[in-house]
Design a protein with these regions (language model features):
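Core catalytic region of metal-dependent phosphoesterases/phosphodiesterases
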Residues: 1-135
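Active-site metal-binding loops of divalent metal-dependent hydrolases
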Residues: 3-7, 105-108, 130-131, 143-147, ...
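Active-site-proximal segments of metal-dependent phosphoesterases and phosphodiesterases across multiple
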Residues: 64-83, 180-232
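Well-ordered, non-membrane alpha-helical segments in soluble/globular domains
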Residues: 75-89, 158-168, 272
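Conserved beta-sheet core of the metallophosphoesterase superfamily
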Residues: 99-102, 118, 122-123, 128, ...
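Beta-strand-turn-beta hairpins that frame and shape the catalytic cleft
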Residues: 131-142, 176-180, 248-255, 282-287
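Binuclear metal-dependent hydrolase catalytic cores centered on His/Asp/Glu-rich metal-binding motifs
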Residues: 136-180, 199-200, 214-222
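A short C-terminal boundary segment appended to hydrolase-like catalytic domains
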Residues: 172-175, 281-299
Length: 299
């Protein structure tokens, strides 16, 4: 699992004096008068990856006036959700031999990701910053940082710094042809990174329009592309650019970005199968097969 782990929103649910509840979701204020309605709302919020906190009107006003308290609550809710996911993985995957390798993205705060590092889980594996042994033949290196964006997210670095991070990981790998490059930022100008070009001087950033058409550009990392072109790993796993799903080849390397439709409650991903190969020194890495749904959505 790779990508931004943290939710995009925390929704306050106001407990009203009448015994009902009030919440504003996606610009619409909803009034809820039953526990069944509240459960339905919580299910919708969970499907969207949002957090929630039930509070009184007075508690809401006090919280809204204190940005530090808002940030603290958001981080607490994010950590609690991640802890719940780890416990779910432990209960479902424990004893099966299946491991779930997980990395964050540029939106994730380090203090939230710390939950993964300290969980001690044997099935929910924080694989960022270390060489992960997928099996006895194949390894994976993971980097969740991205290059700079107009939103100034917590784990952005310059493309040059991203290149140094990647080079440090590559130096730890003995056989790069049997390695997976799990880098959140996609390779530059690869069609896995195509998105609207934004005007960074506006708040919020707005798409640049010329002749009535949005200007599109490749927003991925030049350092990621250089690493793939130079070392030709067996597979590149990427994300970051939500609207640019696809699978392409850079040399021998299959690179994939499943895209994201979190706003619609859709989880996108891919199934990659590494064919078995004989252990003979000098043989190339085994081929990769990718399976896609007829709609184009990866499975």
């Amino acid at each position: 699992l790779g990508g931004d782990i943290i939710g995009k929103l925390a929704v306050p649910i106001i407990r009203e004096g009448s015994g009902g509840y009030r919440a504003t979701l996606q610009g619409t204020t909803e009034h809820i008068d039953s526990e069944e309605g509240l459960k339905a709302l919580l299910d919708r919020l969970g499907l969207l990856g949002f957090y929630h906190k039930i509070m009184t009107e007075e508690e809401f006003r006090t919280l809204a006036a204190d940005q530090a308290a808002v940030d603290g609550l958001f981080h607490t809710l994010a950590r609690q959700r991640l802890e719940a996911w780890i416990e779910l993985a432990n209960s479902r995957l424990g004893g099966t031999g299946i491991r779930c390798f997980v990395t964050g993205g540029n939106d994730d705060y380090p203090n939230v990701l710390e939950v993964m590092k300290t969980s001690g889980s044997q099935v929910f594996i924080d694989c960022e910053g270390a060489v992960a042994n997928i099996d006895e033949d194949h390894t994976m290196i993971s980097v969740g940082n991205s290059t700079l964006t107009p939103w100034k997210t917590p784990r952005e670095v310059t493309d040059e710094e991203l290149g140094r991070i990647i080079d440090g990981m590559i130096a730890q790998v003995s056989d790069l042809h049997r390695c997976i490059f799990n880098f959140h930022d996609p390779p530059n100008d690869s069609t896995l990174d195509t998105c609207p070009e934004l005007d960074w001087t506006t708040d919020p950033p707005t798409p640049i329009v010329k002749a009535g058409q949005m200007v599109m550009h490749g927003a991925g990392s030049k350092s990621v592309r250089k690493a793939i072109e130079t070392h030709q790993p067996m597979l590149g796993l990427h994300g970051h650019i939500h609207e640019s799903s696809g699978a392409i080849k850079i040399g021998r390397t299959l690179c994939i970005n499943p895209g994201s439709e979190y706003g619609e409650g859709i989880l996108r991903g891919g199934v990659e199968r590494v064919r078995a190969s004989l252990k003979v020194t000098g043989l190339p890495a085994p081929p990769i097969s990718t399976r896609w749904l007829p709609s184009g959505a990866p499975i």
